[in-house]
């Protein structure tokens, strides 16, 4: 078991500990449960799926990286597939607060990066801020998405974001988590550039058209890709670097172990992630960063 989970795990009921331990003890446990895992744990612990999501919140919050606020937020995204995806807030020292990943963004993008096609509920240990409500409003399932908070009845996202502004107001019909391939290409690709290109091609960037992807390679040899997730309100958009760092953190790898990165984006796009990605990666100790432009 990753050390970050130990304290929260000890607080769980014995029946839930027994059901979860074989899963969470796996060296490759990456902060998600498959639908089969969820069903097995629910049966063994006598919890339904929603109750299990609440019970898992302390484990999700244990994944938080909050060096500025010291405020740990956890979230569980329940996929239409039945899978559970952990999420936690991530803060980055020495760069703007705007680079923060909120727990709901973390859980939603975690599901997206694992190719989940929709969400039925997001369970979180604190009320979602307006930024997160707007971020989730980009989802195909936004109208029916349930938000579940401790001590409150479940309510739809529209309850927490009435009279919302979203993709429909900008005549956008391709939404976050839709299956998409932009079909862009690169010349002279190596294996890492190919992964970053694939991420760019699956980006959600209907407003700027500035598709972008990134791949991070760690000292252990693992790779993590990130896609750009744009938002109708612009500011809640999630850059590809954060999407990749989120996956890396949830997998339990130290962010300081990134040794190489590849950024792929459009040349002369109205939005570029190159400069801020360089700055943030340098703060994490990685200065070996490649920049590739998509063939137009």
Swiss-Prot record:
Catalytic function, reaction form: cytidine + H2O + H(+) = uridine + NH4(+); 2'-deoxycytidine + H2O + H(+) = 2'-deoxyuridine + NH4(+)
Q: Which SUPFAM superfamilies match?
A: Cytidine deaminase-like
* GO biological process: one example: cytidine deamination
Q: How is the cofactor bound?
A: Binds 1 zinc ion.
Picking any one GO molecular function of the record gives:
cytidine deaminase activity
E.C. code: 3.5.4.5
Q: Where is the CMP/dCMP-type deaminase domain?
A: 48-168, 187-296
User: What's its top-level EC category?
Assistant: hydrolase
| Coiled-coil stretches noted in the UniProt entry, renumbered to this chain | none
InterPro entries the UniProt entry points to: APOBEC/CMP_deaminase_Zn-bd, CMP_dCMP_dom, Cyd/dCyd_deaminase_Zn-bd, Cyt/Deoxycyt_deaminase, Cyt_deam_dimer, Cytidine_deaminase-like, Cytidine_deaminase_bacteria
Tell me which residues bind Zn(2+).
102, 129, 132
Q: Which UniProt keywords apply?
A: Hydrolase, Metal-binding, Zinc
| Superkingdom of origin | Bacteria
Q: Which CDD domains match?
A: cytidine_deaminase
- Cofactor(s) demanded: Zn(2+)
Give me the Gene Ontology terms describing cellular component: cytosol
Residue positions annotated to bind substrate are 89-91
Q: Report the PROSITE patterns cross-referenced here.
A: CYT_DCMP_DEAMINASES_1, CYT_DCMP_DEAMINASES_2
Q: Does the keyword S-adenosyl-L-methionine apply?
A: no
Residues at the active site = 104
**Main function:** This enzyme scavenges exogenous and endogenous cytidine and 2'-deoxycytidine for UMP synthesis.
Question: What's the family?
Answer: Belongs to the cytidine and deoxycytidylate deaminase family.
The subunit field of the Swiss-Prot or TrEMBL record says: Homodimer.
Q: What is this protein called?
A: Cytidine deaminase
Q: Which organism is it from?
A: Pectobacterium carotovorum subsp. carotovorum (strain PC1)
